């Protein structure tokens, strides 16, 4: 996965990621391996914009792109930092989806203005495999758009960036079925109607779920792009 620099901005090549997935599925089919299901997780915050016809409007911005520098301060002039944090419980960082979307809104971005749906990266890849649009809870939580108490998209924050819940896919939690491989993907890969299941779409969430702890009294340290330490709780602290 490599950044693409075009016109002074950094993007992800989601079609390359899709091609890599297809190549992997072809290899599995060639080996005759049995697949019970497919799940996709990725890094957080980044997203794609889809038009009314379901097609990609633009390659997704990469969170390392500098277009969101100063974005939190601009947003907090309308809704306070404490209110945003109180609803979401997410660390304020300029590249969170909330601030990416608000930056696009303030700049009258043509892709956002034409967008019918917003899909986070793992959900976009699942959509390309199944034709089904969903918004998985853990990946949506990285956006700073999910209310940690209701575990749903927060209407006030959506309104602030000019969106509604209808602009996102069906809200799902890990373990729910998204769909099955489309006939096109089946034909390309040589696989059958394999189910695609929502996992913790945020890769850190999937990593924590896989911690081989024997009881609930444990802490985790997940090291990837950076290191995150925490504990599992039944409700927000």
What are these regions (language model features)?
Residues 1-58, 74, 86, 170, ...:
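N-terminal glycine/serine-rich phosphate-binding loop of ATP-dependent small-molecule kinases
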Residues 13, 38, 65, 104, ...:
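Residue-level signal for inorganic ion chemistry
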Residues 23-31, 103, 107, 211:
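A generic secondary-structure signal
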Residues 31, 78, 107, 111, ...:
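Alpha-helix C-cap/termination motif
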Residues 42, 64, 175:
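Residues that line or immediately flank small-molecule/substrate-binding pockets and catalytic motifs
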Residues 47-73, 115, 119-154, 191-237:
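Glycine-rich phosphate-binding loop of actin/hexokinase-like ATP-binding domains
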Residues 72-78, 93:
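Flexible glycine-/small-residue-enriched beta->alpha junction loops
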Residues 84-204:
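Gly/Ser/Thr-rich active-site cleft segment
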